[in-house]
Amino acid sequence: MERNKRRKRRRRKRIMRFILLMLLIVTILLALLIGFFIVRHFYITIYNQTDIVLDAGHGGKDPGANNGDVIEKEITLSIANMTREILEDAGYKVKMIREDDRFVELTERPVIANRKNAKVFVSIHCNSSEDGEGKGIETFYTEQKGESDQELAEKIHKEIIKQTEADDRGVKTADYTVLVRTKMPAVLIETGFLTYSTEC
């Protein structure tokens, strides 16, 4: 019994070490790439009052994916909070869809972003698979809007894969509510599989 407890504690520590490393890499890359995209496309300096909306997936009564030890809604909020801190230190004005463990309706998220007149919308998620074999990072955008959505998705995805050496699941199109109903370039990033042993 005691041996099993020690094994579980060691596994929990490995999980948290990996997640912290992944969080750090993804957060830094997200912040840098979002900033670069905004400066390039909107011809502004980093000191302009520019709204970037970060959407930490799930929250409150909607936990998202989990592997028993780690819950998606907690990971996405951690990534979003750290990304916000880096961007704000660089002079950007950042808005969060949620700042704590609260539930926000899916249809309300793009409404919040549009109300803020944001320049970029980034929705952050973690993936899962029933068989535990799914792995890698994938990024989504919608074709219903302009080319800026695709360019933002491709830039963020390319650099995250390059720096993390994670399995590349590609840049894909999807008509998710938060992508279609936002009025600014928007992407949804699946940052890794909580159900895959080496990614969690």
Regions found by a protein language model. Give the residues of each.
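N-terminal Lys/Arg-rich, disordered targeting/topogenic segments
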Residues: M1-F18
